Amino acid sequence: MSVVQNNTISTNSITEATSANGVSVDGLKIKDYSLMYGSNIGLTITSEGYVTKPNLPSFVAHSNTPGSGYQSTTGVFPANATNHNLGNHFNTGSSGSSNHAFTAPVDGVYLFTFSSLHSNETATSRPMFYVNGSSDFNGVKHGISNVDSEGSNSNTTSSLIKLSANDYVQVKSQSGSMYYYDQYHSTFTGCLIG
């Protein structure tokens, strides 16, 4: 008996399935139950009524390029290290079109954030999110941030993006160079929210 069919939960099926497993629905007594995302547990309801999402994909990536001072790039933000990478869906490699990118394991809405410390003494920095190599997806440009004053500036860009499984997301400079302070001062984060 299937409780979830075509992404729809049937309350009749829940009643039948839980009754078949000896669990009372009338008293809202539920034994530990898990919903799966592929082979990963996506949601757990404990017998105490707690709901957790232990394996939703998420990451915090940064550049760990050695040195000090400001770095610049005209392409993809070189996030070649992670603080955490739940599900291992962030690619820190430097080859291929999806380098320094998060690849969606499932269809859904994801939240992405890019926070950085910029140096813009002579240039405008416009980091933005690219999906599958394009900044123009769903007819909308996501996450453009202009920083164009002299000296150092902090900057945070975030966006909710609906992705299909195997879509990938990167941070790139829209035009010109993207200036960022080395190592841990600039981070690219993301997680599945629904």
Predicted segments, located by residue:
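Beta-strand acidic-aromatic groove motif in beta-rich domains, primarily in extracellular
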Residues: 122-129
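Short strand-turn-strand beta-turns centered on an Asx-Gly dipeptide
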Residues: 130-134
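Exposed beta-sheet edge/beta-hairpin loop segments within beta-rich domains
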Residues: 102, 159-163, 175
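Extracellular carbohydrate recognition and processing domains
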Residues: 140-156
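Short beta-strand-plus-loop segments that form exposed binding edges in beta-rich domains
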Residues: 172-178
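Short, surface-exposed tryptophan/glycine-enriched loops
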Residues: 152-168
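Terminal (often C-terminal
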Residues: 8-9, 19-20, 27-32, 36-40, ...
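Short, intrinsically disordered N-terminal pre-domain segments
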Residues: 1-15
